[in-house]
């Protein structure tokens, strides 16, 4: 389960921001997770609670904003939405797609005290 390691990375980011911003408690963490990122949101929620137990993010709410996948079709030169890497272009049916979005996971915002 790589979500545990991802949550540990999130805590590192939160703690680094706490040092920079001089806050002592995190109330909410907003994450953007791309549809093509291979991150399971429910597994991430479970791991987040365990990993944050003894940190400044203990008890913090985890809000997940799911981002759609997108790609550029080399066949018809259009930007299209995709939900899986092997999807066909919704405009022309081509499988010659170059992924342009939806692969990332990032901390978007923190609510702190």
From Swiss-Prot:
Highest taxon listed in the record's lineage: Bacteria
Keywords: Metal-binding, Nickel, Zinc
Keyword Metal-binding appears in the UniProt entry: yes
PROSITE patterns per record: HYPA
Pfam name, any one: HypA
Keyword Zinc among record annotations: yes
Binding site for Ni(2+): 2
Positions that bind Zn(2+): 73, 76, 89, 92
Gene Ontology biological process terms from the UniProt entry: protein maturation; protein modification process
MF annotations from Gene Ontology: nickel cation binding; zinc ion binding
Functional note: Involved in the maturation of [NiFe] hydrogenases. Required for nickel insertion into the metal center of the hydrogenase.
Database matches in NCBIfam families: hypA
Family: Belongs to the HypA/HybF family.
Name under which the protein is recorded: Hydrogenase maturation factor HypA
């Amino acid at each position: 389960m790589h979500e545990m390691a991802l949550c540990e990375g999130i805590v590192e980011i939160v703690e680094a921001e706490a040092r920079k911003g001089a806050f002592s408690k995190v109330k909410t963490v907003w994450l953007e997770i791309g549809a093509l990122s291979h991150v399971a949101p429910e597994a991430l929620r479970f791991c987040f609670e365990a990993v944050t137990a003894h940190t400044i993010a203990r008890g913090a709410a985890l809000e997940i904003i799911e981002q759609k996948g997108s790609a550029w079709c080399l066949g018809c030169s259009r930007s299209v939405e995709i939900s899986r890497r092997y999807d066909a272009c919704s405009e022309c049916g081509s499988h010659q797609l170059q992924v342009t979005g939806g692969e990332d996971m990032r901390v978007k915002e923190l609510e702190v005290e």
